[in-house]
């Protein structure tokens, strides 16, 4: 089997993990205590779900996941929550004091005390796998644990499991809503450190998700639970092809092959449709063409940026539910003709398509309507550089005055790391800019 191990780091990672595992359990008919009643066995013994769950002798299904946080309160909620029997107690690893929004604490002082137990647990999980495919790491950019500890973990995973792919699901600091003043510092330090270790990073911007919840689901004041349930649908769409048998299945390495043209340009933009409340869904058709079209609306993106200002390098459409290739081809053909989608000229307009016949599942009592079909689009576009530019600008404003830097230096970091990280980000922006330049322009320059 091609197993995946999920690692959930820090408060954001753990809470995303809660939502995701809740959804996986519903999708596979696994009860909160890990049992799978025989009448619920889907499709008469489709065992693809073993990529994410391992089965014990007693017939219990245990997620292949590790939850880590440097302080216990968030993980304690799992220990006392409805899914407490699902996880092995040693899969929930907590420290005593938190990283206090400080990258240096997560990466150096406090992180290094907890990294070995975490790696031991990951080693035990990987020993249970017959053919480990890779890791999915969930975290935020802005928090201390999410930024600092994740980058430490990614470095160590690269050493221990060099050839395995590592995908990240990262919560990008929202442009308007901020949970910490030092988010730009943490984000840039973690991006710099994990850039060479991560194979593919799906970014999710809280503000974009807030807006989707407000606009499409009519939730006036979305809570993190609302946000995480929406995020979990996206994660589920991306991983569905690993967990179910499908017509056109996509595995982890296939994502990278199709979405990442250059090692550093590995930040695809995710878009999901239809995000719709039950009241509205009843009155709408939501055909393949409609949901495919919706993916090209900036309003449905997980990161605030405008793909109309950028160019696409690759595009991957993952359908699930009642979808046939004929409809998909028609929808894509329509988009190619009428949408102003600009691809870079060195990449012919390729759309990679995955189809999975398992319809999307919704959490009972959740906000999303039960629909027959859904689509998740992953596109690698140069527009995401806008997100980096915003972050870099905020970093510059603070760093020019060396504001808050003493907290980092006090935990054993050197000031040089800041400027080094910032230079790396400048290089990343430049990389994005160069990828978007038409190749025939380069040839003219060479002749002069």
Curated annotation (Swiss-Prot):
The modification N6-acetyllysine is found at residue 40. GTP binds at residues 11, 71, 140, 144-145, 179, 206, 228. The modification Phosphoserine is found at residues 48, 439. Its cofactor is Mg(2+). It is found in: Cytoplasm, Cytoskeleton. The modification 3'-nitrotyrosine is found at residue 83. The active site is at 254. Changing residue 215 to C: In ALS22; displays significantly different distribution in terms of incorporation into microtubules. Changing residue 320 to H: In ALS22; displays significantly lower levels of dimer assembly. Keywords: Acetylation, Amyotrophic lateral sclerosis, Cytoplasm, Cytoskeleton, GTP-binding, Hydrolase, Magnesium, Metal-binding, Methylation, Microtubule, Neurodegeneration, Nitration, Nucleotide-binding, Phosphoprotein. It comes from the Eukaryota. It holds the Pfam family Tubulin_C. It catalyses: GTP + H2O = GDP + phosphate + H(+). Its EC number is 3.6.5.-. The keyword Protease does not apply. The MREC motif may be critical for tubulin autoregulation. Dimer of alpha and beta chains. A typical microtubule is a hollow water-filled tube with an outer diameter of 25 nm and an inner diameter of 15 nM. Alpha-beta heterodimers associate head-to-tail to form protofilaments running lengthwise along the microtubule wall with the beta-tubulin subunit facing the microtubule plus end conferring a structural polarity. Microtubules usually have 13 protofilaments but different protofilament numbers can be found in some organisms and specialized cells. Interacts with CFAP157. This is Tubulin alpha-4A chain. The gene is TUBA4A.
